[in-house]
């Protein structure tokens, strides 16, 4: 069975999302082991690194063929770090009750929508009605996974949720940005 270019492209994107989740796991483990939780120059760098990794591996490839691609790729990684921070801050400090699934669904959907808009505007990519619909649905489902706690001894808390959210958002970006 021969893969079409679109199928191959999606497989590469999903593989990059898996690498992003693996690097998330590594950052969490190293942060806990070496107590890298302190701020450097006002930044909680392990915290921001998680968003940067997703942006660099999942969002930045959309800017690969554009003019000023390096600047756009860096901008997408930075946007991802900011989106990650906004989602976490909303979940922890927002107006909704932290103990319900609603906060996770809302934060996940909002972060996914912002991710799609960032790619469409910064990469840039042609905007379609499918992008906000797909990212909102993917983000909501991925966000709901954060309400489901799995006590794996070998994995940091919520690894399954990051895996679900990142893969679903990766798929939503791929399908939502197609013409």
Spans of model-derived segments:
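Juxtamembrane/disordered regions of integral membrane proteins
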Residues: 2-179
């Amino acid at each position: 069975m021969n893969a079409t270019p679109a199928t191959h492209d999606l497989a590469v994107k999903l593989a990059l999302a898996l690498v992003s989740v693996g690097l998330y796991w590594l950052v969490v483990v190293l942060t806990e082991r070496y107590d890298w939780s302190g701020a450097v120059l006002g930044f909680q760098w392990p915290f921001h690194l998680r968003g940067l990794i997703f942006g660099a591996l999942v969002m930045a490839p959309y800017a690969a063929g554009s003019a000023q691609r390096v600047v756009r790729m860096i901008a997408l990684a930075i946007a991802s770090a900011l989106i990650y921070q906004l989602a976490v801050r909303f979940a922890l400090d927002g107006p909704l009750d932290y103990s319900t699934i609603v906060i996770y669904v809302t934060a996940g959907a909002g972060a996914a929508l912002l991710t799609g808009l960032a790619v469409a505007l910064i990469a840039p990519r042609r905007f379609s009605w499918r992008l906000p619909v797909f990212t909102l649905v993917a983000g909501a489902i991925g966000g709901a996974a954060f309400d489901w706690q799995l006590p794996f001894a070998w994995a940091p808390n919520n690894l399954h949720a990051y895996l679900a959210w990142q893969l679903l958002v990766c798929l939503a970006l791929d399908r939502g940005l197609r013409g």
